[in-house]
């Protein structure tokens, strides 16, 4: 960890429209600002969150509000999206990679269509942990009703592959917590109970601890030294003398890293997040190309086929003006390269309209180094028309 900073975790509110996601976000910041000191704890009003600034991720505009808060042990970055379509885009493009999600369900309605859709998407994009905030409990005075809603949510979470029986379900009211004068009030206590549930979530393993992987952006030949490839190290660490594989587009080649450079300085090692140049032993410039990856031996393979969850841009977002059908052949921008591929739609789906999100099967023209959870853009004539995440590799 850098200079004694608190461990950091990314969370987001998910759930059906009008169930109180944004109100909860405001209540979290307000109660924590009253209860705990800390630079990160500033009360954020509902309107500030609701008028979320726009960001771009993979060429797609998404309205997201980022707030932060902290406890004694951790720092949280919290994302809330005002619009339902923004949630889907956000989850698929990974504009904010959530380590954990707070599922907001209204006690008056129970699970609704978007509740299901968000849980399913959370699972597919790799959100490991969920805690549940049952909102609007102040207007339900029937305990049995609350128990039924809780049971329904637990069953739904189990259905989509989460440990429904073990997940924390906190019953509260975001509006009441916001209105309370006292920070020790009964509804504010519920907010603290939710924070305690978040505190129990395992900290994510950051990418440095994973096997080395770097996507090649450029290839140079340096007279007297050999071939250097450059790119951003996606995960892991590379040291001089490490064995590495070159994977994708061609047969796997094995080599050894004989040098690591950053900003024209020689280093002993490069790590996740670094933009580095890697010198490769015995590899000619024409043996390697942009779009391949360097990897720790045996850690990644190249494939042509995969299943994915994709979001297709609307016309107003710069996407297509017309639907597409099965066997549509756009380019897939995977890591650092465009590869043409063929799209197969699910049985019973005739066509995909701009603005849809859909599960597809893809067959690429050339094998590329891919893994489950990898995000990609779909392009046509050099512009992004969709975005996706790989949910399954097809051998």
Curated annotation (Swiss-Prot):
Keyword annotations of the record: Cytoplasm, Elongation factor, GTP-binding, Hydrolase, Magnesium, Metal-binding, Nucleotide-binding, Protein biosynthesis
Residues involved in GTP binding: 15-22, 80-84, 135-138
Domain tr-type G span(s) in chain numbering: 6-205
Region (G5): 173-175
Span list, region G3: 80-83
EC numbers on record: 3.6.5.3
Catalytic activity: GTP + H2O = GDP + phosphate + H(+)
Binding residues for Mg(2+): 22
Chief localisation class: cytoplasm
Residue ranges, annotated region (G4): 135-138
GO cellular component: cytosol
Region (G2): 59-63
Enzymatic class: hydrolase
Stretches for region G1: 15-22
Pfam families: GTP_EFTU, GTP_EFTU_D2, GTP_EFTU_D3
Oligomeric and partner information: Monomer.
NCBIfam families: EF-Tu (TIGR00485), PRK00049.1 (NF000766), PRK12735.1 (NF009372), PRK12736.1 (NF009373), small_GTP (TIGR00231)
Protein family: Belongs to the TRAFAC class translation factor GTPase superfamily. Classic translation factor GTPase family. EF-Tu/EF-1A subfamily.
The name this protein goes by in its record: Elongation factor Tu
Source organism (scientific name): Ehrlichia ruminantium (strain Welgevonden)
Gene for this chain: tuf1
């Amino acid at each position: 960890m850098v200079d004694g900073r608190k461990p950091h975790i990314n969370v987001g509110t998910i759930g059906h429209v009008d169930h109180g996601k944004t109100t909860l976000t405001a209540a979290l910041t307000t109660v924590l600002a009253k209860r705990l000191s800390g630079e990160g704890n500033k009360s954020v009003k509902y309107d500030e969150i609701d008028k979320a600034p726009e960001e771009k991720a993979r060429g797609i505009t998404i309205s997201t509000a980022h707030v932060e808060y902290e406890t004694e042990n951790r720092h949280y970055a919290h994302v809330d999206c005002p619009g339902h379509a923004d949630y889907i885009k956000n989850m698929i493009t990974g504009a904010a990679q959530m380590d954990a999600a707070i599922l907001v369900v209204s006690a008056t309605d129970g699970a609704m269509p978007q509740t299901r859709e968000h849980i399913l998407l959370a699972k597919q994009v790799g959100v490991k942990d969920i805690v549940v905030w049952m909102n609007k409990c102040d207007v339900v005075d029937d305990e049995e009703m609350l128990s039924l809603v809780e049971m329904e949510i637990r069953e739904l979470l189990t259905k989509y592959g989460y440990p429904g029986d073990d997940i924390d379900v906190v019953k509260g009211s975001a509006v009441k917590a916001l209105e309370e004068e006292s920070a020790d009030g009964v509804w504010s206590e519920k907010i603290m109970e939710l924070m305690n549930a978040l505190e129990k979530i395992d900290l994510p393993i950051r990418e440095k601890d994973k096997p080395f992987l770097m996507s090649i952006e450029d290839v140079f030949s340096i007279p007297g030294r050999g071939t250097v490839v450059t790119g951003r190290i996606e995960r892991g660490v590379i040291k001089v003398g490490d064995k590495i594989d070159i994977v994708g587009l061609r047969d796997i080649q094995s080599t050894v890293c004989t040098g690591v450079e950053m900003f024209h300085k020689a280093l002993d090692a490069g790590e996740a997040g670094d933009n580095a140049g890697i010198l490769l032993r015995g590899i000619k410039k024409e043996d390697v190309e942009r779009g391949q990856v360097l990897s720790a031996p045996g850690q990644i393979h190249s494939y042509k086929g995969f299943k994915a969850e994709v979001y297709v841009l609307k016309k107003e977002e710069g996407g297509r003006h017309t639907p597409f059908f099965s066997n549509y052949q756009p380019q897939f921008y995977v890591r650092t390269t465009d590869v043409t591929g063929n799209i197969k739609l699910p049985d019973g789906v005739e066509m995909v309209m701009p603005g849809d999100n859909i599960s597809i099967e893809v067959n690429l023209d050339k094998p590329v180094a891919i893994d489950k959870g990898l995000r990609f853009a779909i392009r046509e004539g050099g512009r992004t028309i969709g975005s996706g995440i790989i949910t399954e590799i097809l051998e």
